[in-house]
Amino acid sequence: MNLTLTRRLWMGFALMALLTLTSTLVGWYNLRFISQVEKDNTQALIPTMNMARQLSEASAWELFAAQNLTSADNEKMWQAQGRMLTAQSLKINALLQALREQGFDTTAIEQQEQEISRSLRQQGELVGRRLQLRQQQQRLSQQIVAAADEIARLAQGQANNAATSAGATQAGIYDLIEQDQRQAAESALDRLIDIDLEYVNQMNELRLSALRVQQMVMNLGLEQIQKNAPTLEKQLNNAVKILQRRQIRIEDPGVRAQVATTLTTVSQYSDLLALFQQDSEISNHLQTLAQNNIAQFAQFSSEVSQLVDTIELRNQHGLAHLEKASARGQYSLLLLGMVSLCALILILWRVVYRSVTRPLAEQTQALQRLLDGDIDSPFPETAGVRELDTIGRLMDAFRSSVHALNRHREQLAAQVKARTAELQELVIEHRQARAEAEKASQAKSAFLAAMSHEIRTPLYGILGTAQLLADNPALNAQRDDLRAITDSGESLLTILNDILDYSAIEAGGKNVSVSDEPFEPRPLLESTLQLMSGRVKGRPIRLATAIADDVPTALMGDPRRIRQVITNLLSNALRFTDEGQIVLRSRTDGEQWLVEVEDSGCGIDPAKLAEIFQPFIQVSGKRGGTGLGLTISSRLAQAMGGELSATSTPEVGSCFCLRLPLRVATAPVPKTVNQAVRLDGLRLLLIEDNPLTQRITVEMLNTSGAQVVAIGNAAQALETLQNSEPFAAALVDFDLPDVNGITLARQLARQYPSLVLIGFSAHVIDETLRQRTSSLFRGIIPKPVPREVLGQLLAHYLQLQANNDLPLDVSQLNEDAQLMGTEKIHEWLALFTQHALPLLDEIDIARATQDSEKIKRAAHQLKSSCSSLGMRSASQLCAQLEQQPLSAPLPHEEITRSVAALEAWLNKKDLNAI
């Protein structure tokens, strides 16, 4: 029979499905039988077991509530336990009735439950009576305690009055003795002893007796009544009698009447003891009932256990029946499984293996040989299977196609070889072009670096010389000319920096460094506008700021780059505005911080507005500029994650808007010190080959108090370090005639690890250079640099303190030394040591005795003496001590430190004079 593979597989699957259906029907019948047996048993067993469990739980809860009822100490708890007992009793009766309906004998359990209920009702009534008694006890006890306290208070008042009278009598006795009236004095003394003091003792005894009664009543308890009731009653009786006797001796009739009235309440102690006695009897009765309840509950639990045993016996019979049905089903399923397995094996061998699997395996082997390259391999017999006949015909066609493909592949291989040779030639040409581009880029970078160095070096000479000349008082008449030289030099430096920034941006922005640090936006904007205010002098232009209140106090960003962009925008506004105003605004807009520069200048043509951010584009060539400012500002805004936009109306004005991400700073903003920094006594080594740069730098540092040794090459620097005293730091130029500055720095770092190295160069200092030299230099100072900035950077890198943090006012001491000489300062210091220092001991003594006026006088004298000798920090502490003599810190240590610093300064001056 010539059947297809599909029909043969369908026939095998149909037989397996029929076998599966038969097994399922037999298994379903067995499971249905087991389920019916289980249902018949569980419908009766499970509810019965649940009722038995609930009965046990209810009896346990009833016992628990009975125990809590006995210990109930308030009406709320008493009622709650009573309700619980009622609920559990009703639940037990309902369960017993349900079990009786199912054929169980519950007569004994019901009788036991009735007895327990009667006992619990009696127990509840006794607890209620006990609560009422305890309420009465509490009220009466409080009344007696309050009455005793009132008696004690009245007795204390009488005792105080008697003591006052005795004091007056005693004072009179002294007067009589002074007047020499001896007989009258003796009579008064007898009255004092026999009457006044005796009355004081009696009233004190009355007060103590009242307090004793009060304490005895407060300490009364059920346990004491049960143990020693007669003794307590006798003690209270004696104490009350004492109160009654002392009440009669009270002289004040009103007080005596009050005490008598209060004693009536105290005398009710016998009623209080009777209440405690009744409470004790009820507690004993309750204890007896509780013991009886435990015995009854034990009997009840025994009856319930017997009932549970009966229920479990019935359940065991039902489970045995269920196990027999389950075993019958298991044997049936096992037999069915064995028969099904044999039938399945027969179907798989006869239908699947002989008719499908084996012919397919032979055909697959033939196909594998064909795939391995044996194209002419013969195919096996198809065993009358239509699909295999079709595969044979297809493989013959495949042989023909393979031969044709082989021929076509040979042709393609020849074409690929030719194309590969052409591609290799193109790759070689591309590499050559790339190498030429890299050489051009390197040449451009080298040109910019050389240009920067060659321009910055003479520019440093121009700006430095102008600054030094401006400090010369003899050249005040030429100050405007020097200012013009400085402004021109700074403008040239700005143009150079713009060209370098544009070059870095054009190279892809890799060398454009953008920091991320906390800064204060308001001072940044105000100081930037203040710097531009000098350019509007004599011009009809008004500069204004408008900073919104929603601008945070501190933000995160690059304040230097932000200042650069805003300065560029303000410069453009000043360049294109002849009159009117320029407003610097700042506000927030959602998650952005906006800085706007709006002017009333000539405006920009809308057709050119889109081009102004392109390099070397100028609105008007008459206004000057390089045409790079807006390009650099726009690219810097993008580097900081923001954007720069502009709107303008011709003849009305323009508005440039800088948008930056609004990121509020969480870290504190570091405070910058803008005051002059003194470098007194600091030895510095300047390694610089340019003579003009040497001279200007040395003069700048000398004016700050530093001692500078200038060296022109690396060899002299090494020789100087070896033969001279140690230096605090070395300023190293990068371009030296004999050795590269970075190479020299590596050698100095190895030979003199304690020497601080600071870069001092006119090169382009980009992020790459900083990272490459960060392990060698504490920092890099770019040339040109103003004198104040040079001192501040050196102080920062050397971690020096500002001038105000020094103990001495060096400028004052220098002036005094020039006017009167150091010998006079030596004399002042000796007088200070002889006369002023002992004032410190006086301050210590006055502080110990809390004499603030003496401390103020001594602190005032010390403040004047310290101020005369230039001891600034010590003088400040003395002024603070004068204002707060008892709480301000003492100036002892600071004065000692200032004296030592002054002696060192004088010794240094003496050595310099020699």
Curated annotation (Swiss-Prot):
Name its cellular compartments: Cell inner membrane
The membrane-spanning stretches of this chain are 9-29, 333-353
Which residue range or ranges hold the Response regulatory domain?
683-798
Top-level EC class: transferase
Q: Which residue ranges does the record assign to the HPt domain?
A: 821-914
Q: How does it sit in the membrane?
A: Multi-pass membrane protein
HAMP domain spans which residues? Answer: 354-410
Keyword Flavoprotein in the entry? The reply is: no
Residue ranges annotated as Cytoplasmic topological domain: 1-8, 354-914
Q: What function is annotated for this protein?
A: Member of the two-component regulatory system TorS/TorR involved in the anaerobic utilization of trimethylamine-N-oxide (TMAO). Detects the presence of TMAO in the medium and, in response, activates TorR via a four-step phosphorelay. When TMAO is removed, TorS can dephosphorylate TorR, probably by a reverse phosphorelay involving His-860 and Asp-733.
Q: What is this protein called?
A: Sensor protein TorS
Q: Which organism is this entry from?
A: Escherichia coli O157:H7
Could you tell me the gene encoding this protein? torS
